[in-house]
Amino acid sequence: MMTHLRPALASLLALSLLTGVAYPLALTGIAAVIAPDRAAGSLILREGQVVGSALIGQGFEGPGYLHPRPSASDWNAAGTSASNLGPTSAALLAQVQERQAAYEAQNGASAPVDAVTASGSGLDPHVSPANARAQAGRIARARGLEEAAVRRLIEAHVEPPLLGLWGQARVNVLAVNLALDAAGA
């Protein structure tokens, strides 16, 4: 029996070290050299302090801020999840209708789909350009800015589809909100 057990345990140990230690460390090291900011989580710093990540959404609720998509996990990255409500769910319909009414009351514009539906992860850092533009008036009024200035700031933060082909144009909510704060209003 030991003749079979010893090679099996040696293989288990060797493969565990290779796939559980060496491989992850090698990839982390390569990533740190090739794309150090992305390897560290695409963290955004202000005055030496981490204020968020470009890849993980966070909630903003004040009228002077660009609001993100709804989150099924209440912006908890450790508990990220979708709502798991099906497309025929009465509870989902009620949530969407409630969000739509609130959005339209706050912004005076019809709600784009991404303003009333949570993403699969619940932590999308982006909204559609249409969603961001629809919020410009509310943000401008709350901050005492001209709506055109807020729209220019939003347009400056529109990210195109990857290589112009994949995905959709999008606006990073945290980047816009930090730019609004930096504008001083």
Curated annotation (Swiss-Prot):
The keyword Cell inner membrane applies. This is Potassium-transporting ATPase KdpC subunit. The keyword Nucleotide-binding applies. It comes from the Bacteria. It comes from Cereibacter sphaeroides (strain KD131 / KCTC 12085). Its main location: membrane. The system is composed of three essential subunits: KdpA, KdpB and KdpC. The lineage of its organism: Bacteria, Pseudomonadati, Pseudomonadota, Alphaproteobacteria, Rhodobacterales. One of its GO terms (cellular component) is plasma membrane. It holds the Pfam family KdpC. It is found in: Cell inner membrane. Belongs to the KdpC family. Part of the high-affinity ATP-driven potassium transport (or Kdp) system, which catalyzes the hydrolysis of ATP coupled with the electrogenic transport of potassium into the cytoplasm. This subunit acts as a catalytic chaperone that increases the ATP-binding affinity of the ATP-hydrolyzing subunit KdpB by the formation of a transient KdpB/KdpC/ATP ternary complex. One of its GO terms (molecular function) is P-type potassium transmembrane transporter activity. It is a single-pass membrane protein. The chain crosses the membrane at residues 14-34. Keywords: ATP-binding, Cell inner membrane, Cell membrane, Ion transport, Membrane, Nucleotide-binding, Potassium, Potassium transport, Transmembrane, Transmembrane helix, Transport.
